[in-house]
Amino acid sequence: MLPTTSVSPRSPDNGILSPRDATRHTAGAKRYKYLRRLFHFKQMDFEFALWQMLYLFTSPQKVYRNFHYRKQTKDQWARDDPAFLVLLGIWLCVSTVGFGFVLDMSFFETFTLLLWVVFIDCVGVGLLIATSMWFVSNKYMVNRQGKDYDVEWGYTFDVHLNAFYPLLVILHFIQLFFINHVILTGWFIGCFVGNTLWLIAIGYYIYITFLGYSALPFLKNTVVLLYPFAALALLYILSLALGWNFTAKLCLFYKYRVR
């Protein structure tokens, strides 16, 4: 399913937006429209957001093809519907409560962990990564010059959210069923299962991030975004050889946070 919004009107003579339409398409106007829709659930397309979440696991290329469609119809790469962000927030809250239950935390400790995870791990780290990638991509990866070839900050944040969602589901939901009875048993199989889930989750993040930037036709050398795979594979092998259980360390970190 694709949005049916009509193409942004342009001048028939030179293809340039009229002053009125140009104002409507400024970053500030787009940001205001996005934030305004955040408080109007009836205006959000949750069905389409769920479709995107499914395809981020099975065929993430299809998700970015829709970003191309949005650029053609609405003259912007970034999402203008916060439904995906809202659903991601719900996933984050539910999975964090699940972590609190698995780690035998009190209500207050679980609530404190939820605040940390939402505002620091998701929002704070997301803003930092998006801003860093926005700066790097515009400064070093743009193949052409001009306003039409700028990487939108909102798009870099969307790419982060797209990549973060599979990581969240794998590490904050699927992993919950293995923590107490497999991963934290102290056996090698526990370390293997836990670290393999981390390998898959971070691998998804790297790959979906690469797809997001390679989808922009005016960027060059996007293949460098796949280079971390080599370090990831090396770290995975090293962690198994040395017995580093990343999930055990995450659980200790979460418990330390809520003290």
UniProtKB/Swiss-Prot annotation:
The annotated region (Disordered) lies at 1-21
Residue intervals annotated with topology Cytoplasmic: 1-82, 131-158, 203-222
Per the UniProt topology annotation, the Lumenal ranges are 104-109, 180-181, 244-259
- Main subcellular localization, coarse class? nucleus
Q: What is this protein called?
A: Protein unc-50 homolog B
Q: Which GO terms describe its cellular component?
A: Golgi membrane; nuclear inner membrane
Similarity comment text for this entry? Belongs to the unc-50 family.
Record carries keyword RNA-binding: yes
Q: Per its record, what are the GO molecular function terms?
A: RNA binding
Note the topology in the membrane.
Answer: Multi-pass membrane protein
In the UniProt record, what gene is named as encoding this protein? unc50-b
Tell me the organism: Xenopus laevis (African clawed frog)
Matching InterPro entries, A to Z?
UNC-50
Which UniProt keywords are given for this protein, alphabetically ordered?
Golgi apparatus, Membrane, Nucleus, RNA-binding, Transmembrane, Transmembrane helix
Which residues fall in a compositionally biased region of kind Polar residues? 1-11
Any one of the GO BP annotations: protein localization to cell surface
Cellular compartment(s): Nucleus inner membrane; Golgi apparatus membrane
List all membrane-crossing ranges: 83-103, 110-130, 159-179, 182-202, 223-243
Q: Species lineage, top-down? A: Eukaryota, Metazoa, Chordata, Craniata, Vertebrata
Purpose of the protein: Involved in the cell surface expression of neuronal nicotinic receptors. Binds RNA.
